[in-house]
């Protein structure tokens, strides 16, 4: 190496350059990405280690004894009929009187799975994104869908813009009542709706087996409306009474399964209230509302009304009828009828409820019906039984309409 005097600038010769380039020093291993970002088992934080095993001398946790069955009350009033005995004599007993259901084992927390939120694809930039939230109101059997906004939608019109709206569809189900839509916003690719659409009559069973399809479309006055993009949310991903917010990328149209059995297609649902009034000495039947009714008219709607009978009807005087609601598949009635009858005789009776489509100049069309009483099963039997066991208490339940009722008169 060349020696330098004090005050001189350090210089490096070509030979020294060669030595530095050829012999850079000891070779060290190149660090990998995993050295900077260590891997951990899914779901564990970096500082989490294996759980410590319980010490062998730790006392065992005592098992919780199951609660014994409640015996029926021995001090019933003499003037009240023994409803359980009557059900045993005239029909099937639904089992123990309604009480707190046995505690279910705690559900395992779902794994953290990536929602549509940070998802990115080619469709994300081509079709746009959609922000919305879903809430299942378990007490009122309602699914609230709030459509907030969309961003970066695909241009559909000649001016480079679109006239977007959002359409909801519950799958499976082909009924027009299963479809809801927002208003249309004109000439925008970044619409803000802040609009809430609600499905009524949604049960816990629906939340397990149904999927909500959300489509963004472009409205065209002179041609068919055009599809922009969609997303689908299995309702089982929602927790009851908990709002879940989504920000997703729209996808191309997915095929709808049309192989589902048409015989299982629902005719609609009806919300009925029952109450035995001690003051009026009679059964109060409330027809509250219907939801998702089958369309019977050419315009895709129905003109529904409801009839009720208390069977057997020897005198043929038990018929009651609501008002007709025009051009709707989700009518609200809020009407109540009273049947004067002794409490003890109700266990021998059945309540027949039928929904009809009103037509001018021709016979009315049967939409669907339901029978509550001693010969019913499931929720229909339980609703009737709960009414008889709880005098002066209004009990409200949703019931699925069927296309056939055993022994019922299906002509108006």
Curated annotation (Swiss-Prot):
Residues 112-123 have a biased composition (Acidic residues). Keywords: Calcium, Calcium/phospholipid-binding, Cell membrane, Cytoplasm, Membrane, Metal-binding, Phosphoprotein, Repeat. Ca(2+) 2 binds at residues 297, 303, 357, 359. The modification Phosphoserine is found at residue 411. Residues 95-108 have a biased composition (Pro residues). Gene3D superfamilies: C2 domain. Residues 49-70 have a biased composition (Low complexity). Ca(2+) 1 binds at residues 157, 163, 218, 220. Residues 1-90 are annotated as: Mediates interaction with DYNLT1. GO terms for cellular component: cytoplasm; plasma membrane; presynapse; synapse. Residues 1-36 are annotated as: Negatively regulates targeting to plasma membrane. The keyword tRNA processing does not apply. Its cofactor is Ca(2+). GO terms for biological process: calcium ion-regulated exocytosis of neurotransmitter; calcium-dependent activation of synaptic vesicle fusion; positive regulation of calcium ion-dependent exocytosis; positive regulation of insulin secretion; positive regulation of vesicle fusion; protein localization; spontaneous neurotransmitter secretion. Residues 126-250, 266-399 form the C2 domain. Residues 38-123 are annotated as: Disordered. InterPro entries: C2_dom, C2_domain_sf, Doc2, Rabphilin/DOC2/Noc2, Rabphilin_Doc2_C2A, Synaptotagmin. This is Double C2-like domain-containing protein beta. It comes from Homo sapiens.
């Amino acid at each position: 190496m060349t020696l330098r005097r004090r005050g001189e600038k350090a210089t490096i010769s070509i030979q020294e350059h060669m030595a530095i380039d050829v012999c850079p020093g000891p070779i060290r291993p190149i660090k990998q990405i995993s050295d900077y970002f260590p891997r951990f088992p899914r779901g564990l934080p970096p500082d989490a280690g294996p759980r410590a095993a319980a010490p062998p001398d730790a006392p065992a946790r005592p098992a919780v004894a199951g609660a014994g069955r409640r015996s029926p009350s021995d001090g019933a009033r003499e003037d009240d009929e023994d409803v359980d005995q009557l059900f045993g004599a005239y029909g099937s007993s639904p089992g123990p009187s309604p009480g707190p259901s046995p505690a279910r084992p705690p559900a395992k927390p779902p794994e953290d799975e990536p929602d549509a939120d940070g998802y990115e694809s080619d469709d994300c930039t081509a079709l746009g994104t959609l922000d919305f939230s879903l809430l299942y109101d378990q007490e009122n059997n309602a699914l609230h869908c709030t459509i907030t906004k969309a961003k970066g939608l695909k241009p559909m019109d000649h001016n480079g813009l679109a006239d977007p709206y959002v359409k909801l569809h519950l799958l499976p189900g082909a009924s027009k009542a299963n479809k809801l839509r927002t208003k249309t916003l004109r000439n925008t690719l970044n619409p803000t709706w802040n609009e809430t659409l609600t499905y009524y009559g949604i049960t816990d069973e629906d939340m397990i087996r149904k999927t909500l399809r959300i489509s963004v479309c472009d409205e065209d006055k002179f041609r068919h409306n055009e599809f922009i993009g969609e997303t689908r949310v299995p309702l089982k991903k929602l927790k009851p009474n908990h709002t879940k917010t989504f920000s997703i990328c729209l996808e191309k149209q997915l095929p709808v399964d049309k192989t589902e059995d048409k015989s299982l297609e629902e005719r609609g649902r009806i919300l009925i209230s029952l109450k035995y009034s001690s003051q009026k000495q009679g059964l109060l039947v409330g027809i509250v509302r219907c939801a998702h009714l089958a369309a019977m008219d050419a315009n895709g709607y129905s003109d529904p009304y409801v009839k009720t009978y208390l069977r057997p009807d020897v005198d043929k005087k038990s018929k009651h009828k609501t008002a007709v609601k025009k051009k709707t598949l989700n009518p609200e009635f809020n009407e109540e009828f009273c049947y004067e009858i002794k409490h003890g005789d109700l266990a021998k009776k059945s309540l027949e409820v039928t929904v009809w489509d009103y037509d001018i100049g021709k016979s009315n069309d049967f939409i669907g019906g339901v029978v509550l009483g001693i010969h019913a099963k499931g929720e229909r039997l339980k609703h009737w039984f709960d009414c008889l066991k709880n005098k002066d208490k209004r009990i409200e339940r949703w019931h699925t309409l069927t296309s056939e009722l055993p022994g019922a008169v299906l002509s108006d």
